[in-house]
């Protein structure tokens, strides 16, 4: 198979042709600034309003609760830093989990330097937040709980509705980083008790450089970027109209095809998992087997170094990763895999394969066949594996 097989959709996705076509006029034809008052600007404003409605409908929010940002990381920073600023008089305690994206963890580290106290609740072996530990961590000065909807590395989906309920029962705001889940699994901000939500365009076949922040009416969040009066005076800066149009169209498509796309991806995902676990020895599936994103496969191979595996897969025309693209190049094992209890030597042998509905069974079979050869080749060069096999055969 000579064509490229892309299995890194958790890192970014291909822009749908329909999304691109929707965006194109707003680069050179309808190029007006939507904040202007002349009639030419009304076309851009209508496009922004339409996109805001599409995003709101995807998560059952009101249109005036949707704010456009420069990406998921900005939205995460906004949620944590602005909440800290606005509610510091009530308290300086924030709760999050040990497996959050670094956009959350590094922001928490920043806030710690500013005098805030962060509690990092643990997860179980499948990556699910321990609800009893979460509730026990709440204090009178707790102002925010931030837990991701689904993990970007191992795909585990959190019990968001229950977490939101716990937060609200204690009078605490609840933010969720939904960057990996938005458009892929059903999200209802009302039913799930969500006060703030972060999302990104390029994870749902939309453009890069555009994100979403949902803020429930009544939540006192301050401006994060200061300047003009855009986004109801909460996020200054000329609106990225093509990007906004793109994420709006991508959200509209995601809402319409979610069930069909999920079914296709789950079928491919489970086929891949079954073959890997059956045909390759000494392998571990990471993440919850059932409560996981439809397109996520994350496994660890014993006596394998992840980077070597990725290089050989790349030579075979397969794009994959060993964890988050935001931490690629790091020699440290994944903080997510360490948090679910894996030792360093096993965490180093991780592989993340994230599919799309465009992939085929033939592609999945090709990748597994190549993977079998690669694992056998790498283990044949490992003295540790040789010693392990000898001990097993005694």
Sequence positions of predicted segments:
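Pyridoxal 5′-phosphate
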Residues: 1-394
């Amino acid at each position: 198979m000579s064509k490229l097989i892309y299995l890194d959709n958790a890192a970014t996705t291909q822009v749908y042709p329909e999304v691109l076509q929707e965006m194109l006029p707003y680069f050179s034809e309808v190029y007006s600034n939507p904040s202007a008052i002349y009639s030419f600007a009304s076309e851009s404003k209508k496009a922004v309003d339409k996109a805001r409605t599409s995003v709101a409908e995807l998560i059952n929010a009101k249109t005036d609760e949707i704010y456009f940002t420069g990406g998921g990381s900005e939205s995460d920073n906004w949620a944590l830093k602005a909440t800290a600023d606005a509610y510091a008089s009530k308290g300086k305690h924030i709760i999050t989990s040990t497996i959050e994206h670094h956009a959350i963890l590094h922001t928490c580290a920043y806030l710690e330097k500013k005098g805030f106290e962060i509690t990092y609740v643990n997860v179980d072996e499948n990556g699910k937040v321990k609800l009893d530990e979460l509730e026990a961590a709440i204090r009178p000065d707790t102002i925010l709980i931030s837990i991701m909807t689904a993990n970007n590395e191992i795909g585990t989906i959190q019990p968001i509705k229950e977490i939101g309920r716990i937060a609200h029962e204690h009078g605490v705001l609840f933010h969720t980083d939904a960057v990996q889940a938005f458009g892929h699994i059903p999200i209802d901000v009302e039913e799930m008790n969500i006060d703030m939500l972060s999302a990104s365009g390029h994870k749902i076949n939309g453009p890069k450089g555009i994100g979403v922040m949902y803020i429930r009416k009544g939540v006192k969040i301050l401006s994060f970027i200061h300047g003009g009066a855009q986004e109801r005076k909460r996020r200054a800066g000329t609106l990225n109209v093509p990007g906004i149009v793109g994420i709006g169209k991508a959200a509209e498509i995601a809402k319409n095809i979610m069930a069909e796309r999920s079914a296709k991806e789950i079928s491919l995902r489970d086929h891949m998992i079954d073959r890997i676990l059956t045909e390759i020895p000494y392998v571990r599936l990471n993440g919850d087997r059932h409560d996981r994103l439809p397109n996520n496969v994350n496994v660890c191979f014993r006596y394998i170094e992840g980077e070597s595996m990725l290089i050989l897969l790349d030579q075979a025309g397969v794009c994959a990763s060993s964890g988050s693209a935001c931490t690629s190049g790091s020699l440290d094992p994944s903080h997510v895999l360490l948090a679910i209890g894996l030792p360093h030597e096993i965490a180093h042998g991780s592989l993340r394969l994230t599919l799309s509905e465009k992939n085929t069974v033939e592609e999945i079979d090709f990748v597994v066949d190549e993977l079998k050869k690669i694992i056998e080749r790498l283990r044949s060069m490992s003295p540790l594996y040789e010693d392990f096999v000898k001990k097993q055969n005694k």
